[in-house]
Amino acid sequence: MRIFILGRTKYQEAWALMKRIHDEVASGVSEEMILVTEHDHVITVGRHGRLNNVLRRELPIYVVERGGDATYHGPGQAVVYPVVRLRGGVRSYLWALEEAVIRTLDKYGISAGRREDHRGVWVGGKKIASVGIAVERGVAYHGVAVYVNPHMEYFYHINPCGLPPSVITSMRQLGVEADVFEVGYAVAANLETLLQRQERLKTRCESLRRIP
């Protein structure tokens, strides 16, 4: 598994690259990869989302394959797109994505966690990272966005994941200054470690099932 830092990208370019890599991984002609990027201003809406959660239509809008509802991406967000085979179920993979963010934030002195009623990573009642994936042919893509130091006013263009815009926070709002790509790389590295552990556990369980 390799980690690539793409730098700042337009959403449609990263989306096309991610889908191409997905097809190659699913076909067995490419290794798994984790892409780290930061997008120009854009709004995406997941496959089960509602366009009426986009409150203002001034930014480019893309309806995409991932789960979830309306999300804003832009400068100041560390966006991590793993293109990886599922080691277990979707729920265990989503747990690993969230856990990679939680462990990263802990290194910056931020105590974060989960909520049972909403996906993502939370600090108190505020959302600091959004998660949304798609799975096709056993390979996951799309991923997670961590709010490092984004332009907070743009979240008022949407109801983020169907929630009020005021629910969003960032590392900067919590008093932590950090580099977007350093945060993104740390999330990717933590995720790689977690997925390797899931792979070892899966292999061990399969070996036990083969014992007569």
Swiss-Prot record:
It comes from Pyrobaculum arsenaticum (strain DSM 13514 / JCM 11321 / PZ6). InterPro entries: aa-tRNA-synth_II/BPL/LPL (IPR045864), BPL_LPL_catalytic (IPR004143), Octanoyltransferase (IPR000544), Octanoyltransferase_CS (IPR020605). PROSITE patterns: BPL_LPL_CATALYTIC, LIPB. GO terms for biological process: protein modification process. This is Probable octanoyltransferase. One of its GO terms (molecular function) is lipoyl(octanoyl) transferase activity. Residues 28-199 form the BPL/LPL catalytic domain. Belongs to the LipB family. NCBIfam families: lipB. It comes from the Archaea. Pfam families: LplA-B_cat (PF21948). It is found in: Cytoplasm. In the reaction, the free carboxyl group of octanoic acid is attached via an amide linkage to the epsilon-amino group of a specific lysine residue of lipoyl domains of lipoate-dependent enzymes. Its EC number is 2.3.1.181. It catalyses: octanoyl-[ACP] + L-lysyl-[protein] = N(6)-octanoyl-L-lysyl-[protein] + holo-[ACP] + H(+). GO terms for cellular component: cytoplasm.
